[in-house]
A protein has these predicted regions:
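Plant-biased recognition of short, low-complexity, intrinsically disordered N-terminal tails
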Residues: 1-28, 37
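Aromatic-enriched hydrophobic runs in primary sequence
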Residues: 3, 62, 115-117, 209-214
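Intrinsically disordered, low-complexity acidic regions
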Residues: 123-225
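Compact, well-ordered interaction domains used in eukaryotic information-processing assemblies
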Residues: 22-148
Length: 225
C-alpha cells in the first residue's frame, strides 16, 4: 500500500475536532499566599488549550504558543507537548494571543485565537462566587475544521475518534450540547455591563458639563483645568 501523501488532499471531505481554550483563576488569600509572591498579585491562573474532556489532542496539534502581557518574563511561551498550558500569578486581566500549530503532514497554517484572561467571577451568581473565593472558569469551545485534509492527515484523524458531546452540562462536564445557550447568556451579561458603564460615564459627563456651565454663568468664565 502506498504511503499517504502529505500534499495530495482528500476531495469533498471535512473533518472537525473540538477543543476548548481559556483559563482558570483562583484568588490568592492570606492562607494560600507564599512569601515569593509580589504583594500586588491577587490571583493564580492557568491558560490552556485542551480537549473538551481533557482527551489527548497532540495527534493533530503539534505546538501551542501563548503570548502574555509584555510585563511577564519571557512573555511568549511555546509548548511542544501536552499539557498545552501556562500557569502564572498576577493582578490584572488582559488579552492572550494563542497560536495553535498543527502536525506537519496536515499542510495547515497555524490557527490564531484570542482569549481575555478572566480573573473575576461573572454571571448571575458572581457576588456569591466572589464572597466564597470560588475558582473562575472562563473557557470557550472551538471546532477546528480540516477541510479536504491531506491523505496523511486524513489517516491520522480517522485513526483517532472525536469525542461525542454529552447532551447536558453537569458539575463534571463543562461542555455539552446545551452549552451554546449558556455562552449566549454570558455574552448578553457582558454586553449589559458595558452598556451600564457607558450610561454611567455619559451621566458623569453631563453632570460635569452642567457644573461648568453654572460656574461660567456665575463668574463669567470657565475655571482653569
Amino acid at each position: 500500500m502506498p504511503t499517504p501523501s502529505s500534499t495530495k488532499r482528500v476531495k469533498g471531505v471535512q473533518i472537525y475536532r473540538p477543543i476548548v481554550y481559556g483559563n482558570i483563576a483562583t484568588p490568592i488569600t492570606k492562607e494560600n499566599r507564599t512569601s515569593n509572591l509580589p504583594p500586588e498579585h491577587t490571583h493564580r491562573w492557568t491558560v490552556s488549550v485542551k480537549g473538551v474532556y481533557d482527551e489527548d489532542i497532540s495527534y493533530f496539534v503539534k505546538r501551542v504558543q501563548f503570548k502574555l502581557h509584555e510585563t511577564y518574563t519571557n512573555a511568549t511561551r511555546t509548548l511542544d507537548a501536552p499539557p498545552f498550558e501556562v500557569s502564572e500569578t498576577g493582578w490584572g486581566e488582559f488579552d492572550i494571543h494563542i497560536k495553535i500549530f498543527f502536525r506537519t503532514e496536515s499542510g495547515e497554517k497555524p490557527l490564531q485565537l484570542y482569549h481575555h484572561l478572566t480573573l473575576h467571577p461573572f454571571g448571575p451568581d458572581k457576588e456569591i462566587a466572589k464572597e466564597q473565593n470560588r475558582p473562575v472558569h472562563a473557557y470557550q469551545y472551538e471546532e477546528i475544521l480540516f477541510n479536504e485534509p491531506t491523505e496523511a492527515m486524513y489517516e491520522v484523524l480517522t485513526s483517532n475518534k472525536a469525542p461525542e458531546l454529552a447532551p447536558k452540562r453537569t458539575g463534571k462536564i463543562m461542555y455539552a450540547q446545551d452549552t451554546e445557550g449558556e455562552e449566549e447568556d454570558r455574552l448578553a451579561e457582558a454586553i449589559k455591563q458595558v452598556q451600564e458603564l457607558k450610561e454611567e460615564t455619559r451621566k458623569k459627563l453631563i453632570d460635569k458639563e452642567k457644573a461648568l456651565a453654572e460656574m461660567k454663568a456665575a463668574t463669567g468664565k470657565y475655571p482653569k483645568s
